């Protein structure tokens, strides 16, 4: 029986500055607090999963620099009991990092890709480990995986195909980018993805039109067409869309459902860094435990709820018992 989850892709040190306001260009704001923590898709997802279930077999895969920032990330990985056998260190590039400006419930990122830009398809293809899930994130931020590849279209598609041949279910996230980059880089990977978990802005790249109205409100009528577009592009099993108001999912049988978010007063939101990854972690854990799809979306929402109570990407993560209690209070059942 396959067991465990591999998290591969961007490993980043988030250097979070909590600011008192958002200044206009040329103006000044005050930094109220500073904190550093692991970031990037696989880091956030695995750290959240480790908090939910410390006994869950987790494996980190990616590239970091041979520097103090890399030492910090490795220490954080090991502290959580995550296996680091698939982590490589670069002598030429620094550990990827992001200066995160967080305030008033918003965030802005200044990113250095560093060693993540060196992560090559063959490094991940060599992982022959029989895990149940292989998570890869973020497409469009991994230079060599985003590069063209003659057989599969991109390096990422090649890696995902290899993981599926090995018997893993593939789970993918990507970042918001221009539609032309989506078509060139993400579309070739869709047929190699079992489960796609993205936000509404990223889904709009496939649909070719916004899923929000001009006043900023969500156009719910476009959620299903966006999910259907991604499924038609080749996603094998499940498309999950998340957005501040809630989440939606479309499975391969054509079943479509939505759930609202857990309500949280705006004044209690400390930061939104990693909220989407927290949602993904909740969904992945629920699917790993064979929970119904509706409960998976609800647990994703609960995971995001706790994420919003911390300035860092995984600092708000809690154990599954607490998540389940919150899920029942928010959604019933």
Predicted regions, residues:
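Short, charged helix-to-loop "capping" segments that act as catalytic/coupling loops
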Residues: 38, 42-61, 140-151, 234-237, ...
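Short glycine/serine/threonine-rich phosphate/pyrophosphate-binding segments
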Residues: 41-45, 95, 280
């Amino acid at each position: 029986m396959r067991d465990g989850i591999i998290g591969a892709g961007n490993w980043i040190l988030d250097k979070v500055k909590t600011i008192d306001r958002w200044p206009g260009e040329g103006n000044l704001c005050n930094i109220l607090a500073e904190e550093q923590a692991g970031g990037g898709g696989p880091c956030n997802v695995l750290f959240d999963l480790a908090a939910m279930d410390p006994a869950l077999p987790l494996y980190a895969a990616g590239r970091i620099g041979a520097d103090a920032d890399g030492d910090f990330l490795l220490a954080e990985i090991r502290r959580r009991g995550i296996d680091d056998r698939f982590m490589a260190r670069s002598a030429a590039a620094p550990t990827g990092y992001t200066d995160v400006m967080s305030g008033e419930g918003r965030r802005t990122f200044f990113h250095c890709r560093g060693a993540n830009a060196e992560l090559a398809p063959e490094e991940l293809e060599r992982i022959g480990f029989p895990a149940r899930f292989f998570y890869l994130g973020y497409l469009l931020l991994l230079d060599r995986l985003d590069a063209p590849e003659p057989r599969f279209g991109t390096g990422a598609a090649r890696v995902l195909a290899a993981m599926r041949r090995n018997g893993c279910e593939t789970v993918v996230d990507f970042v918001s980018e221009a539609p032309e980059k989506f078509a060139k880089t993400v579309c070739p990977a869709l047929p190699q993805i079992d489960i796609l978990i993205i936000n509404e802005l990223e889904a709009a790249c496939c649909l070719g039109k916004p899923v929000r109205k001009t006043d900023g409100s969500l156009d719910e009528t476009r959620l299903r067409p966006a999910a259907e577009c991604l499924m038609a592009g080749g996603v094998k099993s499940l498309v999950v869309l998340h957005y501040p108001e809630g989440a939606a999912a479309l499975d391969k049988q054509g079943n479509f459902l939505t759930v609202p978010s857990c309500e949280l007063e705006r004044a209690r939101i400390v930061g939104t860094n990693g909220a989407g990854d927290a949602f993904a972690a909740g969904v992945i854990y629920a699917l790993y435990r064979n929970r119904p799809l509706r409960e998976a979306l609800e647990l994703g929402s609960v995971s995001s709820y706790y994420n919003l109570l911390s300035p860092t990407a995984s600092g708000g993560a809690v154990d599954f018992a607490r998540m389940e209690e919150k899920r029942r209070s928010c959604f019933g059942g």
